[in-house]
Amino acid sequence: MGKCLLLPLLLVVLSSLLGFPQALECFQCQRVSASGVCESGKSFCQTQGSQQCFLRKVYEGDTVSYGHQGCSSLCVPMKFFRPNVTVDFRCCHDSPFCNKF
């Protein structure tokens, strides 16, 4: 049984050493409430290719209003500012479910 587990583990280690991207599980939700509860479209996604997990939070003043989580190919961390509204967009690829609200 130990030999059966050794081959998949060896393949994972070799692929990470050679730079092949590993699929990453991310939280996915179309609308996360200010308290962190998914209100619409709760599921998980798995990154493919150069995708990363993302988390977008929308603030009104200094208070979180709502958010959005998922997988994205276009993932550039940034902040947008408008009068009384801030949108914070963050990306991660360091660990599974790194886009927790």
Curated annotation (Swiss-Prot):
It is found in: Secreted. Transmembrane segments: none annotated. Residues 24-101 form the UPAR/Ly6 domain. Residues 1-23 form the signal peptide. It holds the Pfam family UPAR_LY6. GO terms for cellular component: extracellular region. Keywords: Disulfide bond, Glycoprotein, Secreted, Signal. Disulfide bonds join 26-53, 29-38, 45-71, 75-91, 92-98. It comes from the Eukaryota. Glycans are attached at residue 84. Coiled coil: none annotated. This is Protein PIP-1. It comes from Sus scrofa.
